[in-house]
């Protein structure tokens, strides 16, 4: 969902994987439209990279995907690892390496692994609910 400077490389990868009929690149979506796409997705892929000393922080979008039972593939740069449990709820890869992104996508699609990861992701996403976060803060004080 969205665009970026690597969209052409990603489209090339999608063609190599023969996934043109299964992957789309929508942009300018409302929150409801975004959630509708997430609900019917098998995998969420956002391999963040460091760019001019700037990097994705926490990456709430991984948690948003997880709440719908969608596992994620995130980049090792930034905060993806705070929301993705590698090899349990998705994969952390080198977003600068097209081969690593490709391998992560291939691995998660293999033997429908994304379904198992998605169930775990949905369970773990609950720890990020505001009610849980507030409860944890109150326990500290």
Indicate where each model-derived feature is located.
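Nucleotide-activated donor-binding/catalytic signature segment of Leloir-type glycosyltransferases, i.e.
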Residues: 9-33
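Short acidic/histidine- and often glycine-rich active-site loop of Leloir-type glycosyltransferases
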Residues: 10, 74-87, 91-92
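C-terminal alpha-helical cap of glycosyltransferases
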Residues: 130-141
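A short, well-ordered alpha-helix in the C-terminal region of glycosyltransferases
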Residues: 22, 100, 113-127, 139
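Conserved acidic donor-binding segment of nucleotide-sugar-dependent glycosyltransferases
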Residues: 86-87, 91-98, 107-112
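Acidic donor-binding loop of glycosyltransferase active sites
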Residues: 39-54, 70
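Short hydrophobic beta-strand element within catalytic cores of glycosyltransferases
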Residues: 62, 67-74, 84
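Nucleotide-sugar-dependent
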Residues: 49-59, 63, 81-82
